């Protein structure tokens, strides 16, 4: 028996779970535009207030994947998504975007799923455009980019057209809802491996278990205890790791990898252009905090991509990729490849 939106709302008010099949049904109504904006707003707010469960999030992500314009990648060995939920309020340069270039230079295939900045001064789409990358690609062009350069950027609005049905509701509500945590769970290229940064410590255990239910292979969900949705240099980082179907939760520290713990304050930027400059300096092997945090995150991404057997081994590969100039070359490679599709 399907649940009505009114029954679902009542369930959230009573702090009771919406079951898997019911959540699938409700989410399909929202994505098709068959639920009124008032009911959609009430339900997603109700879910937020009662706190979304692992089952509810997994069901919602399943439907969002159903409605996505997919990127078909033939060989998914060492294939990883590097993504953050955003919303951490740290306003740093685009660490995960810089990480993509280093990971690709060290042998991973990266499908980065991202958007323009909402809470940040510069989203991944903004900084890639500032670098000269054409982000407006069709799914088959993204697949070609991954095959040719080892990197593909999927601009979220191009791959999730059904999101336009809920976008006005989200905009008007102006508060975090389940949709803020669905983005990183709905990679249109279905990368089996992932490094995912989250904006709240509670999400570490939740998101890694959602990915477990969604059938992912090797995932590291991270939260820097200084509030960053990245592996942090300024504090310990909480990690939820899914590997071989098993979940482990632990903490890592910069010192574990021979790195100094330093404040992330110097990584703040005010614009996409400032982010571009800092990203290029890090990839250009300029000594400093930016290079170190990119190295740390790239090492973690290479471990999640199974290119490296440990984070420590990944960090060494990342250092080599930056020092050799290969990471910086990857920027020019992606710009050249994507510009041929300029419309």
UniProtKB/Swiss-Prot annotation:
Ligand binding (anthranilate 1): 84, 115
Cofactor-binding details, from the entry: Binds 2 magnesium ions per monomer.
Any one GO biological process: L-tryptophan biosynthetic process
The keyword Metal-binding is annotated on this UniProt entry: yes
Sequence positions that bind anthranilate 2: 170
UniProt: 5-phospho-alpha-D-ribose 1-diphosphate binding residues: 84, 87-88, 92, 94-97, 112-120, 124
Annotated keywords: Amino-acid biosynthesis, Aromatic amino acid biosynthesis, Glycosyltransferase, Magnesium, Metal-binding, Transferase, Tryptophan biosynthesis
Residues that hold Mg(2+) 2 according to the record: 229-230
Pathway: Amino-acid biosynthesis; L-tryptophan biosynthesis; L-tryptophan from chorismate: step 2/5
Gene Ontology cellular component terms for the protein in this record: cytosol
Pfam family, one: Glycos_trans_3N
Gene3D superfamilies: Nucleoside phosphorylase/phosphoribosyltransferase catalytic domain (3.40.1030.10), Transferase, Pyrimidine Nucleoside Phosphorylase, Chain C (1.20.970.10)
Leading EC class: transferase
Binding positions for Mg(2+) 1 per the UniProt entry: 96, 230
Cofactor: Mg(2+)
Catalytic activity: N-(5-phospho-beta-D-ribosyl)anthranilate + diphosphate = 5-phospho-alpha-D-ribose 1-diphosphate + anthranilate
PANTHER family per the UniProt record, alphabetical: ANTHRANILATE PHOSPHORIBOSYLTRANSFERASE (PTHR43285:SF2)
Family of this protein: Belongs to the anthranilate phosphoribosyltransferase family.
Role summary: Catalyzes the transfer of the phosphoribosyl group of 5-phosphorylribose-1-pyrophosphate (PRPP) to anthranilate to yield N-(5'-phosphoribosyl)-anthranilate (PRA).
Protein name as annotated: Anthranilate phosphoribosyltransferase
